Design a protein with these regions (language model features):
Chain A
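Non-ligating segments of multi-cofactor redox enzymes
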Residues: 1-270
């Protein structure tokens, strides 16, 4: 099924430098507090918990002293295609309630909790496990004051709906509102960045418009080190990763030996 | 079998039946469209009977919209003040020297300003928490007058009675004045389809994207 689809004006995307990422988890915390992500009494239940930004750890499997570790922060990939050449992500084409769409203005894959009927089809369709289901109503421990920290800019989800990373879309609206107060229609590069980008102490995350060649992200994705997760599925994610380690890039998408383009060592590149 | 071919003695029963059906139908409509809404909405009067017309005469501004913006202002970051806090009222109203001899002003000065208490207004146009509506995009960028959506509210002398849906807790101005779905003015109903209808009419179909109004 092919939808009528115009190219979005902006294509907001993210570049995460895995060589810089220390796996501290600040992005995960920043994301959860920014987006009113509910907590469970038992957060160690990893089958039921919700984390829009998930941190994965991979190792090269070698023994000491050759062990290497890499952390992969994983937001929603905001894919552009479903893998069969259709111009919508896998989750959008399966949604029966039109609760998730590609936003025509930003290229961001939207998720409307009040529209979602909770069939979880999108969760099954997403190759990145970026979607989470609310098994219970949003819960914030009583007496801890957590409910006072809720952001009015993001709606709190009810039970029975799916939620996911929205690239902090409310921050886009906030930036747009401010620009309009100043009489501008276009946003500057630094005006709209996600909470994880802002929080990352290592500066590993870069955020910007992939359609704008002046933005840093559109220059970074041309790097030799750039790759995307499960690239062979052809979902064209708008989240790129940078790594100079071959084993990391190989693990991100089980490449065949001749498929993986080698990265020149840092010393040679300069 | 048509009505004409029915024997005379049975025709009377038929006519009675049809009359009862019509009466019952009209009765059901009266219950559904008039009595049910009366039971569905609870009515509240505002804490202060605010006179917009008097205020409009006394505030600065060249156009009607500019006059509205004197109190219902935009902040620097583009957010909309909505119903102003009493700080804004204090710009003009002084407890030492009241501006007039109206009882409502006295009520404001003694009951709220003296005790530094915010006035618990009922919000006619408060949207559900999942809805994002930037006033600045509509008023400043699209140059839509306040009157276009809010009607004569700004020039009225009396505040209308606030009606709250007992089930959902939302204002009747959002939910729709007429339960039959009939809409005369913009301010009769402000639901999702009304946003989309206006966006489409003005040639801004790109703003019918879900994330434009949802959060």
């Amino acid at each position: 099924m092919k939808h009528e689809h115009n190219k979005p004006l902006h294509r907001y995307g993210m570049v995460i430098d895995l060589d810089k990422c220390t796996g501290c988890g600040t992005c995960v915390v920043a994301c959860a507090s920014e987006n009113n992500v509910s907590v469970r009494p038992d957060e160690s239940d990893k089958k039921r918990f919700i984390s829009w930004m998930q941190l994965y750890m991979i190792t090269n499997g070698k023994e000491y002293p050759y062990t290497e570790v890499c952390y992969i922060p994983r937001p929603c990939m905001h894919c552009e295609e479903d893998g069969h050449g259709n111009p919508h992500p896998p989750c959008v084409s399966v949604c029966v309630a039109t609760a998730t769409r590609v936003d025509i203005n930003t290229g961001i894959v939207s998720q409307i909790p009040t529209r979602c009927i909770g069939c979880r089809y999108c969760q099954a369709a997403c190759p990145y496990h970026a979607r989470y289901f609310n098994w219970w109503d949003a819960y914030f421990p009583k007496g801890k004051g957590l409910e006072r920290y809720l952001s009015p800019e993001v709606s709190v989800r009810m039970r029975g709906v799916v939620e996911k990373c929205t690239f902090c879309h409310h921050r886009y609206m906030r930036a747009k509102r401010k620009a309009e107060a100043e009489g501008r229609r276009e946003l500057k590069e630094e005006e709209y960045i996600t909470a994880c980008t802002e929080a990352c102490p290592a500066g590993a995350i870069t955020f910007g418009d992939l359609n704008n060649p002046k933005h840093k992200v559109s220059q970074l994705i041309k790097s030799d080190r750039a790759f995307r997760l499960l690239e062979r599925l052809n979902t064209k994610p708008k989240v790129y990763y940078l790594s100079s380690k071959e084993w990391v890039r190989r693990m991100a998408d089980n490449y065949l030996p001749e498929e993986l383009k080698p990265v020149k060592p840092l010393a040679l590149r300069r | 079998m048509t009505l004409l071919s029915i024997p005379k003695e049975k025709a009377k029963d038929w006519i009675e039946g049809i009359c009862f059906f019509i009466l019952g139908f009209i009765g059901a409509l009266i219950v559904g469209w008039f009595l049910f809404p009366m039971a569905l909405y609870s009515e509240h009067t505002q804490p202060i009977d605010f006179n917009h017309a008097i205020h409009l005469e006394n505030v600065e501004g060249d156009t009607l919209t500019e006059k509205c913006l004197y109190c219902h202002e935009f902040y620097e970051d583009g957010t909309f003040a909505g119903i102003p806090r009493i700080e804004k009222c204090e710009d003009c109203h002084d407890p030492e020297s009241p501006m007039g001899d109206s009882l409502e002003e006295k009520k404001f000065l003694t009951k709220y300003q003296a005790q530094e208490k915010e006035i618990p207004w009922y919000h006619y146009y408060r949207q559900p928490p999942c809805v994002y509506f930037p006033h600045i995009s509509h008023v400043k960028m699209a140059k839509i007058a306040c009157k276009t959506c809010h009607g004569d509210h700004g020039t009225s002398e009396l505040l209308p009675v606030y009606q709250e849906n007992r089930i959902s807790g939302y204002s009747r101005n959002i939910w729709g004045k007429h339960i039959s779905g009939y809409k005369e003015h913009t301010w009769d109903r402000m639901k999702m389809d009304d946003c989309a209808e206006c966006h489409t009419k003005k040639g801004h179909e790109e703003f019918n994207s879900c994330f434009t109004c949802h959060k």
